[in-house]
């Protein structure tokens, strides 16, 4: 029997005792509080994890998670912690059969550290891991895709239904999904999926709704894992091309939609 697919989740952690997420986490590494046992003092990571592998709402419930806590209780993090976490995932790729990585994180800051994040995700990609990054919620402006999602290699995901988004300080954003092109004139995002009012697991128990490209991204990560379950021989670029063939073109500019919309239910029917 093929070993269960491992998915690395870079986020705020996980409430692993949630009834939908029990026995899902095979490894937990904390770069914020340096604690050994899984926890989530924000909720973002638990919500993302539930979209991927939760029993009730997860797309790939048979997959297992390698959880990297790189964001604190306010959803803030440091580039150096991200880079350490990238290294951990590459070094433990075979141990946990890590075939995909979800990064519902982004920074709009440009500079050396942001470029290092891009280099880091590309190293993961080159090691055989399908890296899926959020386009960020800084739209609708051109060039608003966040790092490391600007990488031309990785799969970058925007939100199709991005009419409204409430940020963590209570500010309402409209048409928020990050748009390309990147500073290197790369068309981004690569795909869109549904990110508005997504129901998933809460770090307080039960369920809650969240919106943003952070919620659209794990849907694509989970679908990538399902593809790899069926086609374990595929390389990251093969998965990206598979998704390209499955995407539905919309009447939108390329720098808004990339290859088009991925509808999880429709794609899963064809895998």
Regions found by a protein language model. Give the residues of each.
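Subtilisin-like serine protease catalytic core
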Residues: 1-27, 35-80, 96-99, 150-154, ...
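Catalytic cores of secreted or luminal carbohydrate-active enzymes
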Residues: 260-269
């Amino acid at each position: 029997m093929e070993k269960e697919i491992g998915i690395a989740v870079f986020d705020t952690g996980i409430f692993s005792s949630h009834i939908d997420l029990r026995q899902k986490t095979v490894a937990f590494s904390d770069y914020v509080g340096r604690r050994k046992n899984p926890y989530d003092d924000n909720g973002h990571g638990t919500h993302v994890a539930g979209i991927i592998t939760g029993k009730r709402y997860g797309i790939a419930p048979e997959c297992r998670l390698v959880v990297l806590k790189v964001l604190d209780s306010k959803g803030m993090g440091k580039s150096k912690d991200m880079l350490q976490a990238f290294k951990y995932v590459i070094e433990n790729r075979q141990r946990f059969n890590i075939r995909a990585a979800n990064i519902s994180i982004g920074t709009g800051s440009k500079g050396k550290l942001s470029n290092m994040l891009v280099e880091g995700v590309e190293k993961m990609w080159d090691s055989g891991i399908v890296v899926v990054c959020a386009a960020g919620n800084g739209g609708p402006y051109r060039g608003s895709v966040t790092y490391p999602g600007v990488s031309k290699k990785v799969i970058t995901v925007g939100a199709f239904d991005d009419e409204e988004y409430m940020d963590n300080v209570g500010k309402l954003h409209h048409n928020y999904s990050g748009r390309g092109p990147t500073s290197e004139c790369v068309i981004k995002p690569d795909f869109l999926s549904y990110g508005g009012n997504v129901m998933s697991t809460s770090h307080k128990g039960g369920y809650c709704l969240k919106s943003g490209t952070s919620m659209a991204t794990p849907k694509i990560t989970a679908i990538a894992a399902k593809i790899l379950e069926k086609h374990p021989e595929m390389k990251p670029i093969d998965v990206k091309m598979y998704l390209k063939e499955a995407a539905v073109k919309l009447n939108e500019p390329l720098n808004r939609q990339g290859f088009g919309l991925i509808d999880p239910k429709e794609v899963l029917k064809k895998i």
